[in-house]
């Protein structure tokens, strides 16, 4: 008799995705982040669901309802901080996952890569709308500033912004619709993640060497299930250390002040995971130009596969490209730092140089250095 997990229509899908899946024998810990992102998503949906049971999306009670969750609901404080810091863990895993893809040439799987970019945009939208919900000062002014960027779109901009706001400013209508979208988007993310996985399983995983590994595959279970469990334990440990010892480390103190449309905070800035894009936005002294640069800072990832000029897939055996990759990492850290600084000298010029370098590395230097490496190897 055949095993039920191989014959049952539903169990068969799970079996082919997580049990009998042929996986390369040499994938490193950098391949753990896909499963960690899945864990983050499940954690966010669960904590978010319990928060939604006690949250009210009305401007008069939103701030109070979050306070109520933290003070009066059983273990409400831990659910709230797990959700807030879970978002940070989500983005840390996202950035490492994308970095892995860039380093090892995983972007050559075009469908998987492009679905990944759509996922990134969706998760960023979800996180932005979630940040608005507590209705603190930074929530309100962050929402005002970021939605206002759409007014830079020629001809339809102003109408578009007022349509999104549901009025002439960020108000009740805005908060209610943001809560609705923030609730539904994670489920859309889940569906997209399933499609992401579907496309990945069409080709199979890449591996650190970038060389096809069809001749050397091992079953996903038990080898990578146990490895993923270890990764999950480390992720949860890190998250809980953050939640239980310094839950407000990554937040903004201004968000503990209830939203006040009549008082602008001295420095409006988004959560840390958006600061790199915010720095690129601010480094261009023109509104429309800044918005375009902001969108392109993420969309540039879609062009990366088209600019792959190397004869090798992975950077494992390409020291010059490795140097450029780590320069890109340092540049992104610089942009993140600049995004949190006031708009004054010397931060303005540093931000502009870092922004230019970011696009230069991805669009010009990487393809050029790859050609040089090909020539050095007489390929």
From Swiss-Prot:
Binds 2 heme b groups non-covalently. GO terms for biological process: mitochondrial electron transport, ubiquinol to cytochrome c. It is found in: Mitochondrion inner membrane. Heme b b566 binds at residues 97, 196. Pfam families: Cytochrom_B_C (PF00032), Cytochrome_B (PF00033). SUPFAM superfamilies: a domain/subunit of cytochrome bc1 complex (Ubiquinol-cytochrome c reductase), Transmembrane di-heme cytochromes. Heme b b562 binds at residues 83, 182. PROSITE patterns: CYTB_CTER (PS51003), CYTB_NTER (PS51002). It comes from the Eukaryota. GO terms for molecular function: metal ion binding; ubiquinol-cytochrome-c reductase activity. A ubiquinone binds at residue 201. Signal peptide: none annotated. GO terms for cellular component: mitochondrial inner membrane; respiratory chain complex III. Disulfide bonds: none annotated. The chain crosses the membrane at residues 33-53, 77-98, 113-133, 178-198, 226-246, 288-308, 320-340, 347-367. Keywords: Electron transport, Heme, Iron, Membrane, Metal-binding, Mitochondrion, Mitochondrion inner membrane, Respiratory chain, Transmembrane, Transmembrane helix, Transport, Ubiquinone. Component of the ubiquinol-cytochrome c reductase complex (complex III or cytochrome b-c1 complex) that is part of the mitochondrial respiratory chain. The b-c1 complex mediates electron transfer from ubiquinol to cytochrome c. Contributes to the generation of a proton gradient across the mitochondrial membrane that is then used for ATP synthesis. Belongs to the cytochrome b family. Heme 1 (or BL or b562) is low-potential and absorbs at about 562 nm, and heme 2 (or BH or b566) is high-potential and absorbs at about 566 nm. This is Cytochrome b.
């Amino acid at each position: 008799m055949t095993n039920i997990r191989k014959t049952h229509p539903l169990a068969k899908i799970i079996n082919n995705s997580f049990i009998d899946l042929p996986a390369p024998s040499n994938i490193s810990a950098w391949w753990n982040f896909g499963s960690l992102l899945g864990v983050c998503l499940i954690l966010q949906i669960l904590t978010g669901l319990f928060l939604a049971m006690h949250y009210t999306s009305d401007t008069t009670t939103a701030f109070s309802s979050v306070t109520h969750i933290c003070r009066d609901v059983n273990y409400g404080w831990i659910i709230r901080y797990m959700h807030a810091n879970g978002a940070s863990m989500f983005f840390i895993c996202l950035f490492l996952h994308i970095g892995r893809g860039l380093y090892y040439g995983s972007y050559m799987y075009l469908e998987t890569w492009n679905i990944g970019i759509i996922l990134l945009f969706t998760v960023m939208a979800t996180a932005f709308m979630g940040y608005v919900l507590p209705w603190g000062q930074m929530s309100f002014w962050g929402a005002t500033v970021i939605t206002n960027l759409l007014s830079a779109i020629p001809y339809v901009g102003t109408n578009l912004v007022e349509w999104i706001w549901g009025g002439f400013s960020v108000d009740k209508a805005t908060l209610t619709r943001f809560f609705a979208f923030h609730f539904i988007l994670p489920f859309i993310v889940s569906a997209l993640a399933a499609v992401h996985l579907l496309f990945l399983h069409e080709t199979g995983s890449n591996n650190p060497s970038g060389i096809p590994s069809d001749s050397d595959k091992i079953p996903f279970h038990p080898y990578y299930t146990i490895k993923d469990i270890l990764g999950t334990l480390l992720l949860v440990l890190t998250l809980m250390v953050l939640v239980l010892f310094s839950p407000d480390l990554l937040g903004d103190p201004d968000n503990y002040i209830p939203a006040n449309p009549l008082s602008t905070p001295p420095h409006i800035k988004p959560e840390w995971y958006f600061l790199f894009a915010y720095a690129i936005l601010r480094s261009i002294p023109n509104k429309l130009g800044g918005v375009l640069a902001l969108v392109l800072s993420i969309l540039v990832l879609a062009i990366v596969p088209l600019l792959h000029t190397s004869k090798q897939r992975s950077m494992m055996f390409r020291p010059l490209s490795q140097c450029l990759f780590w320069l890109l990492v340092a540049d992104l850290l610089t942009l993140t730092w600049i995004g949190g600084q006031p708009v004054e000298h010397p931060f303005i010029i540093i931000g502009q140089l870092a922004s230019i370098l970011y696009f230069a590395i991805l669009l010009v230097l990487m393809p050029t250095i790859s050609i040089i490496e090909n020539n050095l190897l007489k390929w």
